[in-house]
Amino acid sequence: MSDHAALHYCPDLLNFSRRITREVRVGNIGIGGNNPIRVQSMITSDTRDTPACVAEVLALADAGCEIVRITAQTKIYAANLENIAREVRSAGCTVPLVADIHFKPDAAMEAAKWVEKVRVNPGNYVDKKKFEIREYSDSQYEAELERIREQFVPLVHLCKDLGRAMRIGTNHGSLSDRIMNRYGDTPLGMCESALEFARIARDHDYHNFVFSMKASNPKVMIEAYRLLVARLDAEGSDWNYPIHLGVTEAGDGEDGRIKSAIGIGSLLADGIGDTIRVSLTEDAIHEIPVAKALVSSCRVSRQAVQAASRSLSDDAANIQIGWDKVNKDDATFLPHWKIDSGTYAVSFRQADSLPTVVLNRYREARDLILEKIEILTKLDSSRSQLDDLSSLREELNHLETSIIEPALNQGYGSCLFNNNQNAELVANALKHFDGTRYDLLAWCIMPNHVHVILKLAKGEELDKILHSWKSFTSHEINKLNGTSGSIWQKESYDHLIRDGKDFRNQIDYVLNNPTKAGFSNWQWTGCAYPELLARRQNHGLPRDAAATFTPSYNPFSYERRHSKPLSIQGHELGGEKTVRVFTTQSNWNALAHKISQMGDFKPEVIYEKSGAIEIDPRDASAISALNDRTEPTMITVADHVEMEPIHAFRMLAFQANPIHPILLKDTLQPPSEESDFLTSLLTAAKNIGSLLCDGIGDAVLIRGETAPGQSLRIAYNILQAAGTRIFKTDYVACPSCGRTLFNLQSTTQKIRAATGHLKGVRIAIMGCIVNGPGEMADADFGYVGGAPGKINLYVGKTAVKFNIPEDEAVSRLIDLIKEHDQWIDAPTISVSAD
């Protein structure tokens, strides 16, 4: 494990829980806090061309882009932002504009006058990158920081005075020599670079900023963002700044979309990220549907957004019952006190959950109290009458806790919810209308009864909601188990929560009910409050899994899981062996006529014949039986497990003996009909790519995309993008902006056409020197704009050919590859998997 092993970037590695952040205002919209994930992009037009810039901004806004960035190379370019902003506003468009600044503090000062947000790059705002190797003493290092303060503080004051936002955006490829020499070309260096600027901003009481940690390598990007969030959390609760996500230089086509989904999707799945930009080497407008689909595929729901900013203290303080507005209803079994949008504690139980003797004792005591309540309700309303009614209501509460609860906890009756599938049906029913008809604040499903705390939406009625829960679950549980008859008792108990103290007591009662009943690590509880969520237990493991349980991977440094190799259908996998591509029998049959001609790009193992053991990772007995095996066995998560695949496979990896290789699936709910290709692509890349980047996975199976050829192509492209298995040329291509010195899209296509057969060769295509050569990472060769119409060629990060005319540059790149003995002629016949 690294030096960061004690840090935690996520409160729950097995469930989605959105990171709590403050809101940062950017013009008329908010980022973070209680806001949805914002989608943004960047125009590619020359910033001096006002009509072109305005047209591109308006087109992006019409496509659903919520924030638009524009480059400002110099103060002259930045000054034209005034004209662009004026024309955009004159067109009735209110989308916030952001100036992208590198190298020029004076350009930032000018831009802040006209746009709602300024992006600064800590690596080059003041520092310069000359790839110099030198040692900095502490005093020299502090002197450099003072130089940064002198240049950066004026911008901080201006943004504060004008109400502008800021992004402190580190790029892996543009770390300064100062940072590189002290921290290396590492995620730690990226974090320190940004934190230096943040500390300066905070010293001047400026907090309206967000962070980003972009890299072209998804592994580096994921590690950097995780480390940043962990460092922010370690700094203190007031370092809760929003996060801007992006994989820079992702490229185009499927490759660009897959790289973006692996990086951005992995972090969104862990609740990290408040705004995203998908950087494609295509027209900017094509980024928007990808970003929207990516957010949608990560299921960042409205209630999840609300839960991220939900505070137990705030909700408790807001419960103040106006007793004159309480409607006191007589009901068949209990009096129900109702108030619009009230907060209730509700309990309901299985039909056979209580012995007759207990029910009779309860009903006798209850009926005596009801007689007194009936007499009081016939009197004219008064404060004393309400006090008396409250006292009687407390007596009813006492009957629940003194008679009913102890009997329930004895486990009488069929205890249907000891069965995970039955309990899961109830949990899904409770969550179904969360955020629409009610807010689900806390819940607990015990073996034979259920506790819920919820706040009703305006106009909703508790009895109708309770009926829908009981009706749906009765039908589904009977259907699942092949049974019939009543599942629930007609009686239920509800308590109108009257104030903050009562609310806290009820929350505590529900969440601690399993412990009081003698259960440890009971999985069927939930809570809307992150501060409690981090301390609860779920799925049989602590929610803060890293606190008492060592994951099978280091989230801040890649290391492959140490499984043992085995052979399946003639292919070795596991250990350090190649990650294999599985396919279904039906897809194999569809491709069988050309498999022999596919070379490296082909299906390898038939899933149905692989002998892989399917496991529900929540099933302790199944895990125990697996771990009793002494020989490596292929394992995977069973279909229809109601967990997100990332969480389910993590849970499997956490618990299974590491000798067993793991087969990753993109979905646990295989589609029954043709699916949307973009959604399938992004979901597969997020689910499988995230796990591969954490070293989990020895084989992959794609089923979300039903077309045989396309599913196969997705599998291989994910392996390539995750750096797990290289089968073709790899490209690092920036998305273009107003700085770009040549046509990136057409040039990228030309280079692909000429070099796409060079398996294992990595080529960087950079529009200018802002990120390249730094962002070329471990590229073998680089094609970088040096001046208008002129190209510089690189070997690694070293420029070797300068000022080559653009029309000669691709052929000169090929010559350079040949000089370094990495060229082979393209095959004359190429068979596609489609």
Show the residue positions of the predicted features.
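Glycine-rich, proline-tolerant flexible connector loops at the mouths of alpha/beta enzymes
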Residues: 44, 62-88, 122-143, 209-218, ...
